[in-house]
Amino acid sequence: MKFTDAGEVVEMTIDHLYVAGWTGRNKEAVDHHIAELAALGIAPPSQVPLYYRVSNALLTQSPMIEVLGDGTSGEVEPLLIQKHGDIWIGLASDHTDRQLEAHSVAASKQICPKPVAQELWKYDEIKEDLDALILRCLIQESGEWVTYQQGSLANIRPLA
């Protein structure tokens, strides 16, 4: 995949892809989310946080993705890539099939493409300011762009 870092093209081969779930810093908020999902029939995680191995072929930089049915949604997430001892940070979406999630969270993570942004930053250059970064996901509803999800990295566990 081709990314940019400060205007320079950086080519990355992604050999392994993991999706982290249940990563909130606030234990009470994580427990509340687990309870909300349990009410929808989704089994609680075996541990917190929980890491899911998914196919690296799911990564895409396409501006459009195709999914099966209308029961999917994205979640804006930080993307970490390690190459030759360096770590880069970017944006990704853990697009998930919410209906399948009630049967298997692991399968729900594996069935949808994972869009990733093209811009990366070297982790060491921004690590002191990570908690101030705001991740925002916009969706189009009735022809208008609206905020679907927004939060700072201060809401999740430290990345490294």
Where are these regions (language model features)?
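Catalytic-core "active-site belt" of small-molecule-metabolizing enzymes
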Residues: M1-A160
